[in-house]
Amino acid sequence: MSKARVLLKPSSLTTCLTRAKAFFSSVSQSRSISHQMEMGPSDSERYCYDPVLRWNPEVEDYFTKAYGPDHFARISKALTRPSSYSCIRVNTVKTTSDAVIEKLTKILNDSEEGLKLVQPDGSSPVTKCQIPGLDYVVFVNGSGPHKIEYDSGLENPPKEVLVSRKCAEAVLRGAQVYVPGVLACTAHVEKGDAVAVCVAMEQPGDEGDWSVNMTRGTTLQGLPTDPYYRERSGLYIGMGTAMLSRAGMFRVPNGIAVDLNHRVFRLPSLHNILEGEIFLQNLPSIIVAHALDPQKGERILDMCAAPGGKTTAIAILMNDEGEIVAADRSHNKVLVVQNLSAEMGFTCITTCKLDALKSVCLPTTLNESTILINGDNSSSMTSHSELSSNEEMTSVTSRRSEADKSCEKNDSTEQPNGGDNVSQAYIRKNKGRLKNGRGRTQCQGGRAGKSQGFPPNSFDRVLLDAPCSALGLRPRLFAGLETVVSLRNHGWYQRKMLDQAVQLVRVGGILVYSTCTINPSENEAVVRYALDKYRFLSLAPQHPRIGGPGLVGRCEFPDGYIEEWLKPGEEELVQKFDPSSELDTIGFFIAKFSVGPKD
């Protein structure tokens, strides 16, 4: 009893209450901090567009060494955003730049989209390119990033539509949100509802693979308890109006799911506008045609021509006079080039189904003809020009330089070390093919006859716009699948195509090599290979020159592989387009070679 009476003394009770308040206050603060940690970022940080481009760690280390940490960080940031303008090439065979500018201005003025694109000073967003020689190029200026007001907050989170990464990348370039791109949606979304559009990004798996880890049709909750809540933070690309109910989005096969009327980046959608008169094309791709410098009456080969943008750009510079052979290994891709050529009204383009790795037909296997595909999809026989110097090219193809032997040595020593990585990359790629089904590039009808290739020295100029890792394309929201080994393999594959291209250019001709990647293994390293192996090749000046210099030096990898780049003095003879530069283009690389005597 005495102890109980002591506890009830006023002074002791006051002390206990004070301590209790302090204790519960600390508990409350702890819970608040814990709650904030569970909540993650604030609404302003969550409902915004601030993606971080994820790379394979070894690839990130390689690029950091090549470009420097600050420069590579700027490149990575720029890749997650679209260019601030759309670049249009005018088909001068049919129309003029002034006529196109007038038509585009009217089209944009008649649309709600156009009002949002008017420049701050009130000027039109449609302008003519001021680079000398490119007056047939038109820019349509966009804007962004814009701050979007989302109806956010825990008490009233916005209804959300989650789209695939590839859908989001198209939307950032001006497209609408179409049904096939929708992966998940908030419950009870009805037609006409305001919805926030966010992006589903690939997440790392337990076995080193990447996947979205979500079944199409998943219901989003919009609360911290949602298992996908954190993954969407900083990946909101705009607010729009649902054109279908939730049920409709997962029931119908196509159509617009969300009309995105408030975008982080505002770029006009120019799909199906002025067909035959204009072609939407990145500025560096137009520069490639100028680097080739085609002349009227010449015979040109575009080795990897699809979808035909560079082929038709070359035709414009030749004023549709001469012969352009547009080759591609896929039947359906060849048809795409045909259709574009017909749409733009060119007669100098002949399409040909041909694997770039089998482009050269040597005298021992030469057939008198090659099968080409005409515009009416029928096959005809077209004779090749005669082989000008069999002995000349025999010595070229048989001679093995020290650089070639070194490359083969590196190739043979690398494969065992990177075998597991190569297998994993192969498995991932084929998983995607199986999941996505037949692609549009897979032939769905009759097969076109295969070309037998061309004799050496058949062309005045050759363009090799090689298949590549495409790590310069933007916007790009994910880059984690490429490994150092896969990037190196891209370069070896391109060297094999270059070996073919070199043989097809006549003495005194021009060879242009280009890629849409920032990977030095596919750019500077391929140029080094070509110059060391073929002593009759030399880098030639390019006009216009608006890109930056290439990389000089070398890179030594942890596995002992040494990759040689450009030598001092060569860097200014190539053009490297940096996504983070003021030009605001995609990442791109162009090298132009003059072909000397092949002896």
Curated annotation (Swiss-Prot):
Residues the entry annotates as binding S-adenosyl-L-methionine: 304-310, 328, 355, 465
Disordered: region residues: 372-454
UniProt record, GO biological process: RNA methylation; rRNA processing
Bias (Basic and acidic residues): 399-412
SUPFAM superfamilies: PUA domain-like, S-adenosyl-L-methionine-dependent methyltransferases
Enzyme type, top EC level: transferase
EC number: 2.1.1.-
Consequence of gene disruption: Normal levels of methylation at cytosine 2860 of 25S rRNA.
Keyword field: Methyltransferase, Nucleus, Ribosome biogenesis, RNA-binding, rRNA processing, S-adenosyl-L-methionine, Transferase
Feature: compositional bias, Low complexity: 378-388
Domain of life: Eukaryota
Catalysed reaction equations from the record: a cytidine in rRNA + S-adenosyl-L-methionine = a 5-methylcytidine in rRNA + S-adenosyl-L-homocysteine + H(+)
Active site: 516 (nucleophile)
Single GO MF descriptor: RNA binding
Coiled coil: none
Bias (Basic residues): 428-438
Polar residues bias spans: 413-424
Localization, UniProt: Nucleus, Nucleolus
PUA domain span: 158-265
InterPro entries recorded: MeTrfase_RsmB-F_NOP2_cat, MeTrfase_RsmB-F_NOP2_dom, PUA, PUA-like_sf, PUA_sf, RCMT, RsmB/NOL1/NOP2-like_CS, SAM-dependent_MTases_sf
GO CC, any one term: nucleolus
UniProt family annotation: Belongs to the class I-like SAM-binding methyltransferase superfamily. RsmB/NOP family.
Role: Involved in ribosomal large subunit assembly. S-adenosyl-L-methionine-dependent methyltransferase that may methylates the C(5) position of cytosine in rRNA. May play a role in the regulation of the cell cycle and the increased nucleolar activity that is associated with the cell proliferation. Seems involved in the regulation of cell proliferation.
Annotated protein name in UniProt: rRNA (cytosine-C(5))-methyltransferase NOP2C
Gene for this chain: NOP2C
